[in-house]
Amino acid sequence: MAALPIYLDNHATTRTDPRVVAAMLPYFTDIYGNPSSTNHVFGQAALAAVTSAREQVARLLHAPPNTILFTSGATESNNLALKGVAAAQRQRGRHLITVATEHKAVLDPCARLQRDGGEITILPVDGQGLVDPD
């Protein structure tokens, strides 16, 4: 019997929990509309599902539903967060600080912000990946 491979890339993607698969299955097979296309029943059902999910997350976080934003994944989330902070703080100056070991999904938007006139400081790390606080 061949040994099963060991999967060491869970930080990028993981096996989907069977409970999530069961909950999502109807949206892959029966209610597969685009929630932005509300001119048909499939889109309306998808929008209702997204609205319900947003309300559930908002309740868990004690936040207004209109402050909950879903993204396609980590890269989009990182871009949105970094660009949003830079835009919101434009009057105070756009200086972001990150570390050299940060993920490409953070370093790339930082580089873009720098090309657009923002100030980016990338802190080096030592051999153990630690930032020297001095």
Where are these regions (language model features)?
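Pyridoxal 5′-phosphate
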Residues: 1-134
